[in-house]
Amino acid sequence: PIKHSLSPIIHNAALTALNLNWCYLALPCETANLGLVLESLRKINCKGLNITIPHKQEVINYCKAVEPIAKNIGAVNTLIPAKDNYWNGTNTDIQGFLAPLKKCESLAGKDGVVLGSGGSARAVVHGLNSLNLSHITIISRNRNSLEKLLNLIELTKSTSTTYLSLIEGDSSIKEYIRDSSLIVNTTPVGMLNKSKKKESMAIPLGKEYW
């Protein structure tokens, strides 16, 4: 997914505007090489890292310390240099996700759908719980990651007004989307024009899609 990222354009423009002699690069990394890449970047005095899918959960294992907000959702998307060539981890996904939503009408008492159950989904569900939605339905193809997400939410006691389920088949997905006011896609679907699921994931008129 790193190939689709607009982060280099955004951050390099900001660095130029601030007259900082830094650069922001997108670096492909296989999971098997994650530890080696992180160690190498720290040794060359890299000033910080953003972590994207599929590494947001695995990267926790390489952090010297993890901030509470990242611990609560079990995912890290930002690494900050620490002493002795270590990294500290945090998560800014929640703030980034909620910022535009707070400019919209209140979602309190309404239903929402989250597509996916990985690291980004963890942050999204955590953020949605602060908006007092009536129900949140999580739709995932990966039962293992979904069960881990449900266990995490249960441990953080954030399920008092949340309905969570694994839905099989496009027809069921469309039913939940139809009855919800907010749809959040945390999956790779839609990142590439050649996505095979593009047509089947068409969003009904009047729905908010993030």
Place the predicted regions along the sequence by residue.
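Phosphate/diphosphate ligand-binding glycine-rich loop within oxidoreductases
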Residues: 1-104
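NAD(P)-binding Rossmann-fold cofactor-contacting core
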Residues: 133-156
